[in-house]
Amino acid sequence: MIELKGKQVVVRDRELKRREEANRSYLLKLDSEHLLFNYKLEAGRFSGRDIPEGAHGGWETPVCQLRGHFLGHWLSAAAIHYGETGDSELKVKAEAIINELAECQKDNGGQWIGPIPEKYLHWIANGKEIWAPQYNLHKILMGLVDSYRYIGNKKALTVADQFADWFLEWSGQFTREKFDDILDVETGGMLEVWADLLEMTGKDKYKTLLERYYRSRLFQPLLEGKDPLTNMHANTTIPEVLGCARAYEVTGEARWLDIVHAYWNCAVTERGCLVTGGQTAGEVWMPKMKMKSRLGDKNQEHCTVYNMIRLAEFLFRQTGDPAYAQYTEYNLYNGIMAQAYYREYSLTGNKHNHPSDGLLTYFLPMKAGLRKEWSSETDSFFCCHGTMVQANAAWNRGLYYKDDDAIYVCQYFDSELTVQV
């Protein structure tokens, strides 16, 4: 089964169009120099003495160890939006950013393109505590890969391919046990991007990287029917299993698909979910069928919602089971739509003392009496800020699917499909 998307699916739903346009406007509003600041700083291409006025705050400040992560999300979102609409303004902005990233890579010696120093990776290898450098670096790889996939920018692919050489050399110096220790520090979607690059380039080095990034300490217990997930940081594991899904699509090896099914069984089928579809508290998986005690102000992290929707859509394409489409529907309405680009619609016209709009809420509080906390446009940039711009980049995804016998309508939003049957 394949997903029907791109220009053949046109969204007519007014609310979805509002969200998509708000997302586009936000992507264009963010200054390219501020988006690039940490990359230029790392490459020695910033010559100022002070942090520029208007520089991004929150997780993008130059003292944050995850600085620079958002640009990868930005590139991915801009590329996805271009793939849906052919938006030339976003394309021009994205390509200018990619050109500057290529210059940063040259000044870094021809491989490194990260917004953080190489030593962060050496530190985690030595056991020094550092905040998820591979999670961070995956984001720019993802953005470059999506820029090639949706925009066709060959320079983006070249930059990503050369950056991969750094990881090939670095990861090759460790024993299996030592690298498993390194993989215990959140890696984001590195496995997925290696599968993407294997498909795009056909180079054997990506087969090597897929094997090195195989996280047996998570995957083996899942395959044995155990529960390694309860109280584990959820969004560490979901991107890793999305990597297995992508590896299966690219290689056709059943072992990858077995992991995906085992993960879904442990994470969803046996665990259950909140009425909204969410399953986390404080960023970790809640115990199976025992979620009441964990209700509070930090339920349903937006990143987990976005990534689990991606996993559900993969499984729907593989199986055609409507349960996966139902899971997606719960999380679209009660997660993606509930947690970003909020606008109040007053039925009475009465004034209220709560915000009439909001950009993004990291969590969805599920305990009675609590309220959402909305982020800033330029002073937050936590992880969910990135998945927000990706989730709202193109609302024509996940609506229609097709196999040899039928077309499947999976979400009942006002939309138009053009397809040859």
For each feature predicted by the language model, list its residue ranges.
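Glycan-recognition and catalytic cores of secretory/periplasmic carbohydrate-active enzymes
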Residues: 1-421
